[in-house]
Amino acid sequence: MSVSFGRPEALSLVHRSGAVLILVLGVACSPQPPASETASSTPSGAGTVADDLSPQTLAAGRDVFRFDTFGDEQFWTDTARMHEIVQKSVSAAKALSVGLKVDADAIPPDVAAAIKAGKVDLNDPATTVTLLKLNAVVGLKGVISTVNGKDNLTRLGITCALCHSTVDNSFSKGIGHRKDGWPNRELNVGAIIALSPAITPAQKAVYNSWGSGKYDPRFNIDGKSTPLVLPPAYGLTHVANETYTAEGPISYWNAYVAVTQMHGHGNFSDPRLGINIRQTPDMVGPKLASLRAYQHSIEAPAPPAGSFDTEASVRGRVVFNQNCITCHVGANNTDNNSGVLHTPSETGQDPAYALRTANKAYRTTPLRGLWQHAPYFHDGSAATLQDVVTHYNNFRRLNLSVAQQRDLVQYLKSL
């Protein structure tokens, strides 16, 4: 996600400071990015050759995804001053209420037992600082100094996991084992940004209007607000281009987000965006290969047992193949792997966001793990899979019967 502090005047911030994270947005330097990633096919040298899937590389990539800020404390601490707010007024209860998650595996057994017993004050900001000291807040990285027995949060940054990981709630709501790649649809990014003392009341109003699970990755560029649903970061192995508008492959996306959105200390250049950021040392580029390898290793989650009607899904697959497969083609159910994009008028989608992008069109969304990440469409305008089917049945005049629509929904749940 991108934290923006204004409009054209915020463009200077785009070049040196920042935004919250959403692994979205990527505008390739060619009208249609190629399906494969090479160093010559993506800007800023972001492309890579085939993934190194060794255990060492995957472990390194996992650590980057979960814990690496790329030096973005230069924005979140020095500019946004978020550490001050967290230290003074963000209790653990408040953090959980805006969708932040806690990694139960990072909490020592004695602390976990104390929380269970109600002996830890979740309404005290000091508890949040303690959780940061334990490296237990998913997607946040703090530096703690202890003076006269008191822990003080002196630096704060964000990681990829902030928006693209959640937990299984196995300990309690908001606390559990990590689920990397799952979008945190409970995360209220705008409300978090609005806590910053460095933004204006007008900006706070925009941020607070987004709601949970949404973020606008261009607000800091053009000042317009059409927030998007946080996308999943799993099942990406054979997906050519990321983001709702397919503006770049995964390595471009990671470089763009790390430098211009998270505001990490690294290099990114794209003349089409008017961005040319060069920072020494480069704390982003050397980590892109392992990060991509780890992301490619995250498989889409299988639907839970009993979550769909098996017999209906078999019938629904027939309906799908007769009506949907022209666009949702191949193993990952997207024709964008062949370079195809669709104008809003082709799909009946709101054009507002697409018109702000280089491609002015939307990608056919891959469908693996579809059951997990409601709401649907780029703007979350379809609350359920039934809403998706109803939309296309009406817009494309498919004339599906009620039974066919129900079967199709069950098939989509099975993917």
Give the ranges of each region predicted by the language model.
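N-terminal secretory signal peptides that target proteins for export/translocation
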Residues: 1-13
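Sec-dependent signal peptide recognition
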Residues: 15-20
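C-terminal motif of bacterial Sec signal peptides marking the signal peptidase cleavage site
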Residues: 25-28
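Electron-transfer interface patches adjacent to heme c in soluble/periplasmic c-type cytochromes
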Residues: 31-62, 67-161, 165-173, 177-292, ...
